[in-house]
């Protein structure tokens, strides 16, 4: 695999690392969480993020509250806030999740999977079209992890998201860990499920850690990425190389409040080496479940 594939590796920007980034001699690609800034007209969080982003190799913008699959009208105030962040940070990718998070006037602080039906598909496409016209920027949708299924599901997840991308022109943020978690929870083969996604529509990738909760995997973003997930990413990147030699941004997510930046960057480097050479580095071992140490 050509080393050029790895020009666009990075991590999520978190407030706990602001001072470390200010002191860093160089800054890789960063993912900025839109919802941490969307209501800020000023203040320290916006100031720090702006100064750090100015030195980053590139920036991608990621949100969690678009509610693209919900029945409630899309929030114009929220979209206007995203638009301001686009103007400020000039991100190369603007994304949120293929899910719903509001219903009957109530806000769920979880990313709830959609019923994958033709009706839902048409609903999402219509809303994505509106979002892209409003923002004047391509919108990108991420696959979420799932722990339950619906009796009315009729379209596999990869096919569902790929058709939305084809018909709306939106991108796909392929979360490799979410593919792995969902597949294992439903006794599916992760590589088979990954192959359902149209990789030509993928313009960003996420990789993260997960945890074991009794008899299922849970997407927690609080541990090392296991070897099985890195291996799934390696196979994904190999497919990109065969298809069109594109450089797709890969973002390592970790929301553990205790993780220090140097450890996070070391894990990112270990993941690169694993994908290049099959060398595990500091990744945790897994055969479909997290290792005994909780990672």
Outline where the language-model segments fall.
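Boundary/entry segment of secreted carbohydrate-active catalytic domains
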Residues: 1-20
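Acidic (Asp/Glu)-rich catalytic clusters
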Residues: 20-26, 43-61, 77-92, 129-134, ...
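Gly/Pro-rich active-site loop or hairpin
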Residues: 39-42, 73, 111-121, 182-241
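C-terminal helical cap(s) of enzyme catalytic domains, especially alpha/beta-barrels
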Residues: 258-281
């Amino acid at each position: 695999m050509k080393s050029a594939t790895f020009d666009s590796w990075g991590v999520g920007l978190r407030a706990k690392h602001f001072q470390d980034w200010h002191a860093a001699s160089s800054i890789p690609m960063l993912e900025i969480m839109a919802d941490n800034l969307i209501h800020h007209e000023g203040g320290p969080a916006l100031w720090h993020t702006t100064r750090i982003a100015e030195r980053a190799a590139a920036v991608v913008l990621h949100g969690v509250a678009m509610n693209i699959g919900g029945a409630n009208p899309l929030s114009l105030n929220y979209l206007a806030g995203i638009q301001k962040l686009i103007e400020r940070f000039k991100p190369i990718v603007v994304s949120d999740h293929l899910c719903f998070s509001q219903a009957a006037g109530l806000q769920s602080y979880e990313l709830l999977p959609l019923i994958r039906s033709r009706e839902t598909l048409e609903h999402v496409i219509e809303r994505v079209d509106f979002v892209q016209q409003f923002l004047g920027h391509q919108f990108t949708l991420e696959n979420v992890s799932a722990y339950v299924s619906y009796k009315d599901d009729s379209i596999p997840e990869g096919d569902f998201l790929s058709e939305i991308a084809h018909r709306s022109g939106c991108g796909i943020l392929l979360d490799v860990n979410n593919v792995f978690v969902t597949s294992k929870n439903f006794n599916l083969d992760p590589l088979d499920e990954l192959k359902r996604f149209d990789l030509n529509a993928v313009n960003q990738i996420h990789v993260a850690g997960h945890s074991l909760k009794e008899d299922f995997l849970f997407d927690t973003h609080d541990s090392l990425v296991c070897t099985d997930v890195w291996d799934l990413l390696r196979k994904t990147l190999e497919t990109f190389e065969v298809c069109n030699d594109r450089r797709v941004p890969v973002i390592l997510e970790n929301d553990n409040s205790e993780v220090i930046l140097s450890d996070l960057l070391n894990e990112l480097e270990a993941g690169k080496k694993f994908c290049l050479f099959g060398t595990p580095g500091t990744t945790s071992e897994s055969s479909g479940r997290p290792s005994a140490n909780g990672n």
